């Protein structure tokens, strides 16, 4: 079952037809602008920023070639991708279907984030990707360093508060970052797709098995620090989870839940870009969330927690610290086995504000970014939310 691979917690673009040879295909990565945006006829510029801990990240700024001049240009919008994805996920379908293009066509100043470790953000001032120290990070670092630096940079360049859009892990990062006043004060509003701050009700069969089998500890024992699904070693390791244990014939559903509107005919094309690498530490942190039912910083164990945090347990990210005045919009689905409805409801109960909600019973985790009908089902509502915020915006 060499097809399994794109599985692990990913929420990407796989179906039962995917094979190992497909997954191991080389990526055409030059730059996101050159690969995906310019060929569609859109304006795109590459930007580079450096985080406080030395990672070199790529940002892209995208504009429509024919903006609707009857509409006032909207404020800048930052799109933050999910786990094992990069900014390319917002442009993988046609301009009429992809959120990055759709927002640009509505006159928004579109910025695209790519976290450390992805093939667009594979640099560091002193470390190489072959150094284990390069991979010593989890989603809390993506929130506190990567996302915080992106928001600061866009805020400075655009001279405006920004609209923040996150999907999956991008929402985990957003929730954590928005508990920090210095980040929240630069954000006009947030739109979160498949919002996650808690994961203890995950029911995806393959994810449950990986947690039970302690896959995170297995890869550490193998001396691995990077999760790269284009490597033979990881393909074989993840493949073994299905052998004789469970039915993995529909890999995407076993990870994310059933997706109603995913375009399976484009898998070959998607796999030219996805999946992107992440770190073993990041996977371990996500597994900690599932096991402990917490939204907390990375748990190093009793002694190192004391040395790192000054307490025996890692500090929680308090959703109550997100400003009640920050407008939020959330889209979630009844078929999503990662952003489970029970966990979403817990998140809502702890937020000081009352976000606007879009619930789609038939939508799974991937539908919110790759559904062929997402423009009508999801994106038009998000854009209405953003435009309503402009009435009180200083932009």
Summary of predicted features, one role per range:
Residues 2-21:
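Cleavable N-terminal signal peptides of Sec/SRP-targeted secreted and luminal proteins
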Residues 16-20, 156-160, 169-310:
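Alpha/beta-hydrolase-fold enzymes
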Residues 24, 31, 36, 51, ...:
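Short, surface-exposed "cap/lid" segments of acyl-processing enzymes
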Residues 81-83, 162-171, 333:
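Conserved alpha/beta-hydrolase "nucleophile elbow" surrounding the catalytic nucleophile
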Residues 132-157:
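Alpha/beta-hydrolase active-site loop
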Residues 322-332, 336:
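Short beta-strand/loop motif that positions the catalytic acidic residue
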Residues 326, 340-349:
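Short alpha-helix in the alpha/beta-hydrolase fold that links the catalytic acid
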Residues 354-395:
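Catalytic active-site module of serine/aspartate enzymes centered on a nucleophile-bearing elbow/loop
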